[in-house]
Amino acid sequence: MNLADLRYLQSPQGRALLAELAAEPLTPDTHLGVAARLRQRVEPEQAQAVLEMALLRQRAARKFSRAAEMVFTRDGLEQATAEPVAAHRAARFAAAGVGTVADLGCGIGGDALALAATGRAVLAIDRD
């Protein structure tokens, strides 16, 4: 994903298309048909960005309860800590009385989100 893709996905049109795709399961059997429909409505690059994000969000639903609101890259999702694991870690920080946490190399921020949910002050840093 590049910056232009991200901007498009956050635009009203991109959000609307993502919402449409969220309502239908994307499978290997439907993938090509959905891609063709999207390319009839938007530029090929935009269609690819929407389809890729919809697929990633569908996979991410196994890890994140709010996947439909999040933005993913394939690598980021594969490396992301699932919510239950992140919540367990965050609870341990809270129980230890840790007030501020620096999550260096945070990736998409699964651990940072869980830490923040426990009231920790979080500084999340990643190079990309």
Regions found by a protein language model. Give the residues of each.
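SAM-dependent transferase fold signal centered on methyltransferase-like domains
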Residues: 1-128
